[in-house]
């Protein structure tokens, strides 16, 4: 009986020692990330890539003293542009209306009589043509202008799927951030222990744009074929990271 009591007492003592070992002494503080120094850095990356799709934005604009006539003439010319593109082999699904408006303004009739005005109605139909074969972008411009479009607003060269390049740019930006942190730490004579936080500042891409004004549209009508040479698009990413040492 006495032996059993001694065994139980020993067990209790052992558990007490183990329990005390789990308790942090009030005077001893466990290390946390906040106890370390912080190095904050930004990482940036730019990837260039050849575009694989283009969007040609054009417009048909008509004006007349009658709103009905302006709208009807605009519809006729717009249909002619779409039909010409389809006859040239483009799918009708590649042509979308991206804007339409019918507005009016006052125009002076007689320069000698400043009080005499007439109302002019302006119909404006904007079309966006998606082009998959970049070699035919110039053909789209020529066909549209000859069929009735009187403005080429812009030509954008884009990517069908930019997500893979965005991820690659983020990886490159993260690698640059780490390299910066290591360089700073080495210069300061400290060693990086780990990363506290990292987050994406931005990622995206910029299409290659060819912007044209009305005078340039007129020049295109005088020359054929229209040479359109695409440029590379840029995919960019930026991250912010904090490392502790």
Where are the regions that the model predicts?
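Short, charge-dense linear interaction motifs
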Residues: 2-245
């Amino acid at each position: 009986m006495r032996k059993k009591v001694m065994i139980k007492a020993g067990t209790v003592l052992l558990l007490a020692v183990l329990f005390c070992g789990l308790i942090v002494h009030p005077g001893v503080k466990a290390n946390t990330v906040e106890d370390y120094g912080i190095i904050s850095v930004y990482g940036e990356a730019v990837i260039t890539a050849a575009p694989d799709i283009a969007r040609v934005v054009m417009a048909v604009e008509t004006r007349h003293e009658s709103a009905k006539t302006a709208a009807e003439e605009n519809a006729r010319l717009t249909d002619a542009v779409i039909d010409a593109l389809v006859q040239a082999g483009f799918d009708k699904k590649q042509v979308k209306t991206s804007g339409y408006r019918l507005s009016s303004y006052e125009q002076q009739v007689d320069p000698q009589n400043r009080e005499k005005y007439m109302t002019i109605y302006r119909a404006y139909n904007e079309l966006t043509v998606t082009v998959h074969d970049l070699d035919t972008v110039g053909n789209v411009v020529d066909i549209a202008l000859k069929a009735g479009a009187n403005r080429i607003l812009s030509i954008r060269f884009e990517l069908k799927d930019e997500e893979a390049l965005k991820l690659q740019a983020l990886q490159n930006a993260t690698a640059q951030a780490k390299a910066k942190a290591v360089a700073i730490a080495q210069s300061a004579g400290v060693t990086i222990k780990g990363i506290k936080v990292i987050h994406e500042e931005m990622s995206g891409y910029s299409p290659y744009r060819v912007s044209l004004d009305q005078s340039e549209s007129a020049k295109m009508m005088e020359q054929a074929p229209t040479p359109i040479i695409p440029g590379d698009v840029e995919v960019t990413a930026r991250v912010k990271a904090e490392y502790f040492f």
